[in-house]
C-alpha cells in the first residue's frame, strides 16, 4: 500500500528561527519533538547524515540533512515500512512560512495492517503535537489537536496503563526565553 501523509503549520516567524528547530532535533534543546508526551528521538551521534536512531519502535537513519532547511529520515523499522519521513521549511516571498512534515512509504507484509490500525493514528497525533511544540518554541499560541479516543486507547495499551496524558507543550524549548534568562 502506498502512503503519503503530510502535516503542516503556517508559522508567523522568521524561517531561520524555524530552521533552528529542525537543527535542534534529538538534542537537549529540542524545540520541535514533543518529548513531553512521546518517546524521545535519539541518535547514535549528533544530528547529521548517517546518524542512526529513531523513537520508540520506529527506527531510521538521517538520509539527507540541510541545516536550517530540511531533514529526511529513511525507515529501517518496523518491518513492513519502506520509505522516509522528514521536516522541511516551505517559504517564498510574500507568503507565510510553512513547517511541513512528510511521510512517504510503501507498506508490505505486516505493515499493510499495522500502519492503518496502529501507526497512522499514533503518527498523526505525534505530528500534530510536534507542530504545536514548534509553535510554543517560537512563542506562538499552539494549535492543539486533541487525541482521538483510539489514540488514547493505543497509548494506554502500549504503556500498560502508564501513558502520559496529552498536555500543552508549555515546557518546550524557546531560544528567546533562554537568552532572556541568561542575560
Task: Please name every model-derived segment.
Residues 18-25, 62, 71-73, 99-101, ...:
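Hydrophobic pocket/interface hotspot
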Residues 48-51, 55-57, 117-129, 159-176:
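Low-complexity, charge- and small-residue-enriched intrinsically disordered regions
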Residues 38-42, 60-65:
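Short, exposed beta-strand/loop patches in secreted or surface proteins that constitute
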Residues 46-54, 72-78:
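Short beta-strand segments that buttress and anchor functional surface loops
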Residues 66-71, 94:
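Short, conserved beta-turn/loop elements at beta-strand boundaries and strand-helix junctions
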